[in-house]
Each structure stands twice: as C-alpha cells, then as structure tokens.
Amino acid sequence: MIDRYKHQQLRIGLVSPQQISAWANKILPNGEIVGEVTKPYTFHYKTNKPERDGLFCERIFGPIKSGICACGNYRVIGDEKEDPKFCEQCGVEFVDSRIRRYQMGYIKLACPVTHVWYLKRIPSYIANLLDKPLKELEGLVYCDFSFARPVAKKPTFLRLRGSFEYEIQSRKYSIPLFFTTQGFDTFRNREISTGAGAIREQLADPDLRIITDYSLGEWKELGEEGPTGNEWEDRKIGRRKDFLVRRMELAKHFIRTKVEPERMVLCLLPVLPPELRPIIQIDGGKSMSSDINELYRRVIYRNNTLIDLLTTSRSTPRELVMCQEKLVQEAVDTLLDNGIRGQPMRDGHNKVYKSFSDVIEGKEGRFRETLLGKRVDYSGRSVIVVGPSLSLHRCGLPREIAIELFQTFVIRGLIRQHVASNIGVAKSKIREKEPIVWEILQEVMQGHPVLLNRAPTLHRLGIQAFQPILVEGRAICLHPLVCKGFNADFDGDQMAVHVPLSLEAQAEARLLMFSHMNLLSPAIGDPISVPTQDMLIGLYVLTSGNRRGICANRYNPCNRGNRVNFQNERIDDNNYKYTKEKDPYFCSSYDAIGAYRQKRINLDSPLWLRWRLDQRIIASREVPIEVHYESLGTYHEIYVNYLIVKSVKKEILCIYIRTTVGHIYFYRKIEEAVQGFFRACSYGT
C-alpha cells in the first residue's frame, strides 16, 4: 500500500515480470508460494465463499472479514504474540480485510502476449522501435504469418532441401514420417517464429544505443541530400525524417528510464485487487459483477486450454496451438482495451464490456473521478437558472439541496430549541418537513455563506461566495452579472455548491470570496461584472416603449376625418394597431406601476406621468405641437415628450412627461443603485 507521507508522486510505466510476481507472491509457513490465479471461478454457488486459486481467492488476496480465515478461525490483528499469522488449514493470512483493496495477483500466460496499448495505439511504440509497418507486426502477433530466423552453424530446412532433392527417391517414405513427428516441431520452431514471442525476441535483440546512432546517421544523410524537386518524394523524405526523430526520442527514453523494451510483451498478466472489481449481492439471490471479472475469466479459460494443448497432448497440430495463442492474445486485448481492434466484445444483452482502459480513462475514469477529483461531504450540484430579483451577492438554493447541506445545523437548532429530544427525532421532523424546520433553516442560512464552483476552475473567480436564500424548484438561481467570472451561461450549465465549515473558511469566504467584492478581473483589471446579452435584450424590451410619437395618437387613422393632414402623420411600420383611447395620466410612479399590476395598462403603453419642475424643460426653446385651452383659463402646451400645464398668468403649475411603465421601472432601479452607492460612500468616509 502506498504511504501518502513517503510518496509524493506517482509514475506509470512498464514493469518487469519479476516485479509483478513480487507484488503478488506470498510464502506460506509450509513453503508454498501463492499469488497465481489459475482458476476462472469467483464464488461457490452453494457456500457463497471464494473459490480456491480463483479470482477472489482469500489465500491470494486476503480475508473478506478482518482476522477471520476461510475456515472461520479468528486471530487478533496486529498482536505479535498471536502465532501463526497464517491459518494452517486454509492458508489465509490473518490481516485486515482492507488488504483486498491493494493486494494483487497474476496469471502466468502460456505464451507471450503483446500489450495492445503499445502496439495499436497511435503512435505504435513497438512499430517505431522496430522500424516495421504496423500491419506486418499485427499479422505476426495474431499468427497470420511467420518469419524465418535461421540460426548459424545449425542445419536448417532451407539448407537441407538440396540434399533432399538428390535423395528424394531413397527417402520418399521417411520424409513424410519426419514431418508428422514431434521432432519436426522442434526443428521448425528453430527456423520460424510467430506470435508475440517473435516480437519479444526482436525487442530484446537490438541495442538501444545502436538504434539511436543508426537513426541519427540516416537522418543526417537525408538532410544532406536536400530537396529532389519531386513534391511526392520530398514529402516522403520529410515523413521519414520525422519518424527517425520519434524513434530516437523513444530509444533515449528507454535508456534514460532503464526500462527494457521487451516488457511491452507480457509473460505475467497482473490481476487487480478484488475490491476494485467487486461482485455485489442484490435481492432475489442475484449478483452484479464488474465487467473486468468476466474478461479475466475469458483470459483464464483460454490460457488453461492452451496449457492443456502444450502439456497433455503431444500430438497436437502446430496450427491448432497457433490458433489458441491467437485467442489468448485477443482475450488479453479485450481485457486491456475492448474494441481497439474493431468490433468490441458484448454480453448476452448486447452491452459492451467495460475494459481496463474504459475504467481509467475519460471524465468518469478512475483518475479524474476518484483520484484527481473526489466527492466531498456538505456539497451539492444542480443546474443554474437566472435569478433576476437576486442581489449580486445572493444565490437561490432549492429547498431540497439546502436541507441536506445544512441538516446538521438544523438538527442542532431543533435540539437547542427543545423541539426535538435527540438526533433521531430531529431527523424524523426533517423528513416530515414540518414548518419549524424551514424557520430554523432560514436562521441558519442567514449567517452562513456558501461557495459556488463551476468546473473547470481556471482562475480564482471560478469559485465565489454567496449568501444563500431559499427558492422553489430544483435549480440554483444565480445573478446574471456574476456569470462572466464563472464563464457560465443558462443553457444547461451545472454548478457545485459547498458549505465552508470552519471559522477560517467562513472568514475567507466573507472577506475575500464574496461576489460583490470581485468586480474586477484579477488578470487585467477590467470590470468582470458587465451586462450580458440576456440583460441587454431585457433592457431593450423594458425601455422600447411605443415609438409612434405624440402625433400618431392625435391623427389616428381610425378616427380621421376630412381635416386630416397626412404630411404631419407620424406612423411607424411596426405599429399598425391603434386605439381611440387617450394616453392615461398618473400623479406618481407608484400609481402607474399599480395600474400595470392590475393589468389596466401594458409594459410599453404610453402614459403621462407628473414630474417635478425641471429647469431644462422650462428653459427649452422647443415649440409646442399644439395648445389646449380649458374653460377656467388654464391651458396645456403639448410637446413631443412632455406636457406643461400653465395658469392664466402663464405660471407653470405642473409638468407631465410622456413615458412607459418599463422606463419607470428602469429609472427607479438606477436611482436606487445611485442612492445606495452614495450611502455606502458616506459610510466609508
């Protein structure tokens, strides 16, 4: 097991067969060495105990229950006085059951097997190192063809062929007998080679330094030749030079790391610890197993068949042995990377088996899901939606998420207020969702910030603090102005919420991480909280209003007579629907908003709003469009966007401006923001 205090880094590379056996082998008191998995079985169907020498064997991987062997005997773990440490009957070691998370086994392969990652992946390291085409190596690995390897100073079939021709008549009966005997297999195996064993021999023969020097010399020769004038030939030379560079880098890497290239061909296949490929019992006596177990069983079945062919049956044709070696190679390929050679292996339900590569690679793989990023307590995750009514430093948490995040705080509040006598009663009240639970939750949330994070966290603004409030629904509500820091939008993005527990974390969240305190980009200093496209569209809709102008209402086509002057008519193409009603008058913005909420007017309906006396309007030299006189002597001067009511003595009594409810809303929000800014500045000084 890796000690996290002693080991600060992890390196993945090729391992020797001796190291694989050292990981797995254990020596029993009787001198027996265990560690090799020889049987494809998992659990016995009657006793429901692991099969001996199987994929879940307790002798190889350790006991299922701490300190209890397969016989049922118990020993105290860690007690040096307890002797022996192994059960004399079953051979199981008396250790903690957590050993099954890291104790490995191995399968001794009857024939060498090429590691498919180094053969089929791009680039192919085996093909680059041997300087041979990938298709040729594949045909060799999967026994589609063989290559000659005559040995010096020994008779070969090619050398003896001449003597056979002269003595063909005298030996015409003995030669066929020779080809059917076991001696011919030895004779042939010395001359030809196929399978992964041939690859292993080629990887073990050459000197890496010679490969580096030879590749460097060829690269220099190609560089001295210069361009040939033929575009196709120049491209071919360029590709060859690039290949030579990759080959030299690969050879130097093997030299630097002191790794033998023949390790890319496996003789021992490691078996993962059982806890990493579990079998889970479910209701009805059924079980769910990891796909890797089935792939391991497939390898063991085929490997045992090959062992039987090589040991028990001496008269087995060589072609049958080669076919079985190919099946073993394909089984190991499927275990390591299912589907890398084409059609993936499927189960009875037409579901693709998850191989070792599928388990470790990708976003949901072992590294990114478990090692690099782990799930933590006091956290949740949900889709984000816009919260237009929220303040910049607030976020909306769904009730379902909030009650889970702050459950321990709510339980403490229920017990302190004597609403619940113990934790069990408090949890039952939370499950029943009593009203007192939500009241206590509101009190807890008022003094506790939360952290929102959106992956990937590329800079410090990727995680910010907010003051949570309860909202309905199942989505997290977020102010649109903080989206730029998270690089988020509302098209289905998800964000994680975390609860800072310690006082130091809460202080850091309040003083440094609150969203309203991170308004500028830490990189370039530009404003980070700027209106997004959604906000700009909303502001446009809010303030667009009715753009027909004052004249369009007076010269209404629906109410025109013979005195209509079409030259003075102001009509926009997008406003084709008019009414005969006059624009309403309101004494205050509250009356106008109340009328809108009562649905008496629309958001963009034009209206007259009484306004304070504005010197800019009074001093304006604009000529009124028309003047309305009343019976008491007062009169109204009507302009394009405002109206002035004057007395008989030409004193200004009041002013009305022509606006919409949308403009009123927008103006009030701007006014509140400005007043809040000045109030904050006055507090600061």
Curated annotation (Swiss-Prot):
Binding site for Zn(2+): 69, 71, 87, 90
Protein name: DNA-directed RNA polymerase subunit beta'
Keywords attached to this entry: Chloroplast, DNA-directed RNA polymerase, Magnesium, Metal-binding, Nucleotidyltransferase, Plastid, Transcription, Transferase, Zinc
GO BP annotation list: DNA-templated transcription
UniProt cofactor note: Binds 1 Mg(2+) ion per subunit. Binds 1 Zn(2+) ion per subunit.
Co-factor(s): Mg(2+); Zn(2+)
Lineage: superkingdom: Eukaryota
UniProt GO cellular component terms: chloroplast; DNA-directed RNA polymerase complex; mitochondrion
Description of how the protein assembles with itself and partners: In plastids the minimal PEP RNA polymerase catalytic core is composed of four subunits: alpha, beta, beta', and beta''. When a (nuclear-encoded) sigma factor is associated with the core the holoenzyme is formed, which can initiate transcription.
Keyword Flavoprotein attached: no
E.C. number: 2.7.7.6
Entries under HAMAP family matching the protein: RNApol_bact_RpoC1
EC top class, as a word: transferase
Cross-referenced SUPFAM superfamilies: beta and beta-prime subunits of DNA dependent RNA-polymerase
Substrates-to-products reaction catalysed: RNA(n) + a ribonucleoside 5'-triphosphate = RNA(n+1) + diphosphate
Taxonomic classification: Eukaryota, Viridiplantae, Streptophyta, Embryophyta, Tracheophyta
MF terms in GO: DNA binding; DNA-directed RNA polymerase activity; magnesium ion binding; zinc ion binding
InterPro entries: DNA-dir_RpoC_beta_prime, RNA_pol_asu, RNA_pol_N, RNA_pol_Rpb1_1, RNA_pol_Rpb1_3_sf, RNA_pol_Rpb1_clamp_domain, RNApol_RpoC1
Binding residues for Mg(2+): 489, 491, 493
Compartments, as annotated in UniProt: Plastid, Chloroplast
UniProt cross-references to Pfam families, sorted A to Z: RNA_pol_Rpb1_1 (PF04997), RNA_pol_Rpb1_2 (PF00623)
Annotated family: Belongs to the RNA polymerase beta' chain family. RpoC1 subfamily.
Job of this protein: DNA-dependent RNA polymerase catalyzes the transcription of DNA into RNA using the four ribonucleoside triphosphates as substrates.
